[in-house]
Amino acid sequence: MATLFTPLQAGDITFVWTAEGGLYLAVVLDLYSRTVIGWAMGTRLTEDLAERALTMALTNRTSATGLLHHSDRGSQYAATRYQRLLGEHGIITSMSRTGNGWDNACVESFFGTLKRELVYHRHYVTREDAKQDIFEYIKVFYNRQRRHSTLGYDFPAEYEARTAMA
């Protein structure tokens, strides 16, 4: 389990089209390193989808007192089970103002990057094709190879390693 680098993380959900039908992607982003620390994909926009992404994030990162988890006001994030899971880990909830996408700009930016660099250049026949491609993009490219201006043009894994030693 990795060390917690930031007291801030954010979650959101986006939609990817395939010839087989839609695929939803829920992510949790570490706002310090821009690492995607949790994600889940599914055919339905449900509380369980967001909860699976959060569970992965909690598995990948230790939580600390005062950790702030930001999301929009979607029913998946306001759901009792989701809020209970945050509370059980001592995580403070923050939610965007109604109708204000700017409040979750970091995750929206990630989704824009994912779609510009990957999704818009593909024609997914099946949801499984999209899932595999998105998994590889996040795990192999985005977290380990993609450079970020916010991080001084480091990639997330490099930035975390360098700042952990400082």
PLM feature spans:
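Charged DNA-binding/catalytic regions of mobile-element recombinases
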Residues: 1-166
